[in-house]
Amino acid sequence: MSAPVTPTKPPTPAAPTTPAPKPAEPASAFGAYLDYGPRGVARIALLSQWLGGAQLRVAHTYLPGDRWSNIEGPPGFLDVWADWRRERKDRMLVLNVPMMERNEENVSDAEVRMLLRQGAAGAFDQHFRALAQRLVELEVPDTVIVLGWEMNGITYTHRCGPDPEAWKTYWNRIVTTMRSVPGQKFRFDFAPSRGRDAVPWTQCYPGDDTVDIVGMDSYDQPRGLSFDEEVNEPYGLQEHVDFAKAHGKPISYPEWGLFRNGDNAAYMKRMLAWMDEHKPLYNTLTDYCPHGVWQCRQNPRASQVYRSVLFGRTDPTPQPTTPVPTPVTPVPTPVPTPVPTPVPTPVPTPVPTPVPTPVPTPVVPPNCSPLDLGEWVEYWLGGKLCMRFDWWSRTR
């Protein structure tokens, strides 16, 4: 830092500071579930093109829930997703992680209850430790983990209903295990389905210490339900927002889209407006039939709404504020000292160098030998002299 300079005159009072532009609110990242494998990654750029170059900052995939070896992250499965995530710092990888194997095999409530209690006792810790280690090795330690999603329903083996207390203990154990892996920065997303379903999702909430995001899967169902009813129903969209705010958590919508009410443009318009208003950390549309709008051609009206709203969307930039003019203290303008006009130095006209007239080479007569008398003598004589060979001839 330079030394301070003592002013030579009293300092001018500081002018009022122009207000800085209001910082933009954090952008709500969005994307879509396009496929669970490499095709899902490849389609992100194509969907972006369809949306006029909109920035899709979220990639979303699911680990298979058939067996524990796949829940650990099978070799090669996550590599292409990790590659995409690492290409830009502002991207996000969202990974749905089942809490049980045989996750969609209609396991009975009694068996689910037994499995939840085993998990709560630590029987499955090693599988989640292995997954965390794999994600850290792939250099995606900040992956969003949507763990045990839609736990308030009846679809999955990792459902909460058969034993909510064991379920919450098991969730906490999984999170603690994954957080114990060095280098991790995971964010855990608690994402029930909208509405009461089989059990109120608030009964499954495992506590603020092990939840980073409060998500919600919100499809346009059941049939005949208006969007206002989806907002205001018990455990609906409004209660979700209020619950997250009360617990100091950001919200998300890992799954959403059309469903029981078909090609419902009104739902699409209202859901997009809802997310613009409440600014989730991220949202990912489920883009396959009957839910989607790009890969599913049976929803043209909703597709047009989705595309028109998100076309060309990028992160917001700060809005310029009206500049406040800064008062300027007038400073007297000094009178400049006249500077004499310089007189140009005359440039002499160059004298052309005379080119001497070429002197024709004299023709030496026959029977004659030139005499070398030197250049100066030859100059005054007008050339070389020649002595004839026959000057002594007898006939002369």
Feature annotation, model-predicted:
Residues 1-19, 321-396:
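Composition-driven, intrinsically disordered low-complexity tracts enriched in small residues
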Residues 20-123, 258, 284:
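N-terminal substrate-binding region of glycoside hydrolase catalytic domains
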Residues 22-40, 249-327, 364-396:
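Substrate-binding cleft of secreted/luminal carbohydrate-active enzymes
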Residues 30-32, 57-61, 91-97, 143-147, ...:
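Hydrophobic faces of well-ordered beta-strands that scaffold small-molecule active sites
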Residues 39-48, 73-83, 128-131, 194-206, ...:
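Alpha-helical scaffolding within the catalytic cores
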Residues 70-186:
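Substrate-binding cleft of extracellular glycoside hydrolase catalytic domains
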Residues 76-92, 96-98, 204-261, 303-305, ...:
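Glycoside hydrolase catalytic-domain groove-lining segments
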Residues 148, 175-200, 248-262, 285-288:
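Aromatic-lined carbohydrate-recognition surfaces of secreted/lumenal glycan-active proteins
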